[in-house]
């Protein structure tokens, strides 16, 4: 017998959950990837993708086909699916979808700010922005000279507004400060999303909290790695770490003091979930990077999310799995396009 919470979930969200599970069943299989890597050119790739759930999504594209066009059209297709889910959702699932879009909005804001710093035309940068992170005021981002300007003139009416509380300053938006701003926004965003899922409770919390804990810790590791050899102080580095992961508090304190990859690895060695990931990183050419092993772990967690029912995590997991699939296709397409077939199998299979 279903309990009342599960019955309510089915009544409000059961249709969409069934739909997203159907979409997940349409992800590319290992057999599909074997066929893709055997393609001689991008037209062959297009023909094979037509036999999958991607269908004729490239039918209206002029030849010769480019990797950029394939990437753009895949994003548009994902966006159409996501918007269908969101437009047919009820609260609190609608708010969950809004949280999902915030990460793309942050990336778009940073992309536009970097474009403005390099004096690139706004329309050229807008083309590169992710459609899931679109908001009305995006074109005005290039007028901001400080984080305070950015908030007051542009973002005050967007879902990003709450995440700017700890980010407003009068510092000039140079390359380093823009990257610091990105990480502060992500810290506030992940912590808020984690709190929302935890407060929601039930299976959604049981599935999403570990996923977001991993995402928080991954960001802490990557921030640390990217800060080596930069002007960022250890104290400032620590303020950028999200505090909702397994590393909090002691692991983050130790990570802030790390001065090289080996010291980072020693911190990871104290955590059962992260030790094998760092051990899988290879120094050799063509070996796995830290980013690779994090992506692999993310795929595993998102696949496992579908083993549970009656929760919002399937929507997050499907979107992340679809993004990994898109990265795989772009990687294979780039290798085909550039005739660099030696690394064509360095993708991350999902099913």
From Swiss-Prot:
Write down the Gene3D superfamilies for this protein, in alphabetical order: ATP synthase (C/AC39) subunit, domain 3, V-type ATP synthase subunit C domain
Tell me where the transmembrane regions lie.
none
* GO cellular component annotations of the record: apical plasma membrane; early endosome; plasma membrane proton-transporting V-type ATPase complex; proton-transporting V-type ATPase, V0 domain; vacuolar proton-transporting V-type ATPase complex
Instruction: Tell me the InterPro entries matching this sequence.
Output: ATPase_csu/dsu_sf, ATPase_V0-cplx_csu/dsu, ATPase_V0-cplx_dsu, V-type_ATPase_csu/dsu, V-type_ATPase_csu/dsu_dom_3
UniProt record, GO biological process: vacuolar acidification; vacuolar transport
SUPFAM superfamilies from the UniProt entry = V-type ATP synthase subunit C
**A GO term for molecular function:** proton-transporting ATPase activity, rotational mechanism
Q: A Pfam family for this UniProt protein?
A: vATP-synt_AC39
Q: Which domain of life is it from?
A: Eukaryota
This protein's record includes keyword Transit peptide: no
Q: Which UniProt keywords apply?
A: Hydrogen ion transport, Ion transport, Transport
Subunit? V-ATPase is a heteromultimeric enzyme made up of two complexes: the ATP-hydrolytic V1 complex and the proton translocation V0 complex. The V1 complex consists of three catalytic AB heterodimers that form a heterohexamer, three peripheral stalks each consisting of EG heterodimers, one central rotor including subunits D and F, and the regulatory subunits C and H. The proton translocation complex V0 consists of the proton transport subunit a, a ring of proteolipid subunits c9c'', rotary subunit d, subunits e and f, and the accessory subunits ATP6AP1/Ac45 and ATP6AP2/PRR.
Q: Name the protein family.
A: Belongs to the V-ATPase V0D/AC39 subunit family.
Please describe what this protein does.
Subunit of the V0 complex of vacuolar(H+)-ATPase (V-ATPase), a multisubunit enzyme composed of a peripheral complex (V1) that hydrolyzes ATP and a membrane integral complex (V0) that translocates protons. V-ATPase is responsible for acidifying and maintaining the pH of intracellular compartments and in some cell types, is targeted to the plasma membrane, where it is responsible for acidifying the extracellular environment. May play a role in coupling of proton transport and ATP hydrolysis. Regulator of osteoclast fusion and bone formation.
Stated name of the protein = V-type proton ATPase subunit d 2
Native organism is Bos taurus (Bovine)
């Amino acid at each position: 017998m279903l309990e009342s919470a599960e019955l309510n979930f089915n009544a409000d969200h059961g249709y969409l959950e069934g739909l997203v599970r159907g979409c997940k069943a349409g992800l590319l299989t290992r057999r599909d990837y074997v066929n893709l890597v055997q393609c001689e050119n991008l037209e062959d790739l297009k023909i094979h993708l037509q036999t999958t759930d991607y269908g004729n999504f490239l039918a209206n594209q002029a030849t010769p086909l480019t990797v950029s066009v394939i990437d753009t059209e895949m994003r548009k297709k994902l966006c159409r699916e996501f918007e269908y889910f969101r437009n047919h959702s009820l609260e609190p699932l609608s708010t969950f979808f809004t949280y999902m879009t915030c990460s793309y909005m942050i990336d778009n804001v940073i992309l536009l700010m970097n474009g403005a710093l390099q004096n690139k035309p706004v329309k050229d940068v807008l083309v590169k922005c992710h459609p899931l992170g679109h908001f009305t005021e995006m074109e005005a981002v290039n007028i901001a000279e400080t984080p305070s300007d950015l908030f007051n003139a542009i973002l005050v009416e967007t879902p990003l507004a709450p995440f700017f509380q700890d980010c407003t300053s009068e510092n000039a938006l140079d390359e380093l400060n823009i990257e610091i701003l990105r990480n502060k926004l992500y810290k506030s965003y992940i912590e808020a999303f984690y709190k929302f899922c935890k407060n929601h409770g039930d299976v959604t919390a049981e599935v999403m909290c570990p996923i977001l804990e991993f995402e928080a810790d991954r960001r802490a590791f990557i921030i640390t790695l990217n800060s080596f050899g930069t002007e960022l102080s250890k104290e400032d580095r620590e303020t950028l770490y999200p505090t909702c992961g397994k590393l909090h508090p002691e692991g983050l304190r130790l990570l802030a003091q790390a001065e090289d990859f080996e010291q980072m690895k020693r911190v990871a060695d104290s955590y059962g979930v992260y030790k094998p990931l760092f051990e899988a990183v290879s120094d050799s050419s063509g070996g796995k990077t830290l980013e690779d092993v994090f992506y692999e772990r993310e795929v595993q967690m998102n696949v496992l999310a579908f083993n549970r029912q009656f929760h919002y995590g399937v929507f997050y997991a499907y979107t992340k799995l679809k993004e990994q699939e898109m990265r795989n296709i772009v990687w294979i397409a780039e290798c085909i396009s550039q005739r660099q077939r030696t690394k064509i199998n360095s993708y991350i299979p999902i099913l």
